[in-house]
């Protein structure tokens, strides 16, 4: 609440336009760009870029300021893009060193392992998601292509006892963009 009180009544600008700003309570040590919000073009908001959330990068951002800072920060942005690779992200998450702001927070780099899964509830949530966004849940087609789920029967053909859930695509900064659910009857992405 301290930051909210200290910035009350202030408006942040990027050039001549009010800046789009977002809040999140914790990260794994990196923030990401707007590609995490489906349908949002990250390049439309170059000031919201994936980068390490640490004192070194924050100081560089403060020093550069303005629109020229995006170009000057290219090496930092390339660093964040490496985290799109699952093996790089996994290695990064295994590291506990670094001067990341949130490293002492309880939800910093958390993990969760379930011994059992309410599969019926999970598949129901997947179906609800497919109905809400027709281009977000996919099943394999006969020729190996991925087809958007439009009918519940197409989803049901690929469900069943879950064998594995894994991240198959990450955004710059390492945020999970896509999951693959492998079941006894097929796959859902």
Where are these regions (language model features)?
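Conserved, single-site charged/polar hotspot
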Residues: 1-189
